[in-house]
């Protein structure tokens, strides 16, 4: 009768442990194993760890190569990769460790020592990198202080206040310019109104001048008529005197002959009456002409005086408006030149401070990129260090598992069958507190290679029993 196949499972994986036994079923517990056989020691230095045991069943190390590689996970850190696999084989049916078993144990210890030495070297390298990072931070202390841009914020705030003040000053200047433009437009409208009034007055003066010319012509005509009447009067007087003389001479040389006839009219009286009438008519015409001329002259003088005063007032106002417009134009030109200078100064200031801000932003981006790279390196180092810690913890768990297996299988010293085992352990994170380790034992009875019976048992590693 032979036993075949028992398995130890942790988590969800169930590796198999197979072997043959010639004795009947029995229960192997840790309390039944003598202290001498269960004694073992784990000792180590910072560079190595050794596991020693006075005896170790060959069933544990027969097929260890296929499962230890999964129990000891491969890891890479800092460009170095490590993988662990160990194989043990038993010579014959001896359950005690022979020469090959000791060599396998030594090989395992050497591999474990090498692995832990690599872990220690990586830890040393990690410490060196951390020291270099701290030294770099100490060297870059001034650079890290430059990352405090609070004083730049104050300068930027002052510059923004200056820019705002310049904008307000520009707004006030623009408002003054607009007010000056409105005042200039108002004065221009007044000037246009006065210009229209002036043109109207000049047109009236031109019309009055035409009237004056007409009156002058009429006066000249009347004077000429008066002169003609005077000449006619003188001619009439002269002709009258001549007629009188002729009549007197005729009367003196004739004989008076009285004839009973109607009395003759007195021509002198008639001529005198005619002369008086002409004189009265001429005097009347002269007085009427003089009165009309005086009246028209007074009206014309009054109109000319009022027009002259209005024209003088208009000229004065025009001169004042012209001077005001010239002053406003000069002020407008000065304000425009000041505006151009302020705009150029503002553009220069904005360009200069935009360049400064761009340089500061580039420095900030560079420092942030350096900080991101350093943070990424630190996170990478931390993650790799965490992986190493996990590997170390798993390795310690593996050592604990080896210790348990050494304690559990130390009593199997009288079996002559060949037993091969495969131990596998899942990569369960150490930080998972809810993982329960269970052991399932499968016992098969075979006769001539045929399975007669098969039994399965489950329990924790401390409760493992063999039947």
Swiss-Prot record:
<keyword id="KW-0416">Keratin</keyword>
<dbReference type="GO" id="GO:0045109">
    <property type="term" value="P:intermediate filament organization"/>
</dbReference>
<feature type="region of interest" description="Head">
    <location>
        <begin position="1"/>
        <end position="100"/>
    </location>
</feature>
<feature type="compositionally biased region" description="Low complexity">
    <location>
        <begin position="12"/>
        <end position="30"/>
    </location>
</feature>
<dbReference type="GO" id="GO:0005856">
    <property type="term" value="C:cytoskeleton"/>
</dbReference>
<dbReference type="GO" id="GO:0005882">
    <property type="term" value="C:intermediate filament"/>
</dbReference>
<feature type="region of interest" description="Disordered">
    <location>
        <begin position="12"/>
        <end position="32"/>
    </location>
</feature>
<feature type="region of interest" description="Coil 1A">
    <location>
        <begin position="101"/>
        <end position="137"/>
    </location>
</feature>
<dbReference type="GO" id="GO:0005198">
    <property type="term" value="F:structural molecule activity"/>
</dbReference>
<dbReference type="InterPro" id="IPR002957">
    <property type="entry name" value="Keratin_I"/>
</dbReference>
<feature type="region of interest" description="Linker 1">
    <location>
        <begin position="138"/>
        <end position="156"/>
    </location>
</feature>
<dbReference type="InterPro" id="IPR039008">
    <property type="entry name" value="IF_rod_dom"/>
</dbReference>
<feature type="region of interest" description="Coil 2">
    <location>
        <begin position="269"/>
        <end position="416"/>
    </location>
</feature>
<comment type="subunit">
    <text>Heterotetramer of two type I and two type II keratins.</text>
</comment>
<feature type="domain" description="IF rod">
    <location>
        <begin position="101"/>
        <end position="413"/>
    </location>
</feature>
<keyword id="KW-0403">Intermediate filament</keyword>
<dbReference type="GO" id="GO:0005737">
    <property type="term" value="C:cytoplasm"/>
</dbReference>
<dbReference type="Pfam" id="PF00038">
    <property type="entry name" value="Filament"/>
</dbReference>
<feature type="region of interest" description="Tail">
    <location>
        <begin position="417"/>
        <end position="463"/>
    </location>
</feature>
<comment type="similarity">
    <text>Belongs to the intermediate filament family.</text>
</comment>
<feature type="region of interest" description="Coil 1B">
    <location>
        <begin position="157"/>
        <end position="248"/>
    </location>
</feature>
<dbReference type="GO" id="GO:0030855">
    <property type="term" value="P:epithelial cell differentiation"/>
</dbReference>
<dbReference type="InterPro" id="IPR018039">
    <property type="entry name" value="IF_conserved"/>
</dbReference>
<protein>
    <recommendedName>
        <fullName>Keratin, type 1 cytoskeletal 11</fullName>
    </recommendedName>
</protein>
<feature type="region of interest" description="Disordered">
    <location>
        <begin position="409"/>
        <end position="430"/>
    </location>
</feature>
<keyword id="KW-0175">Coiled coil</keyword>
<feature type="region of interest" description="Linker 12">
    <location>
        <begin position="249"/>
        <end position="268"/>
    </location>
</feature>
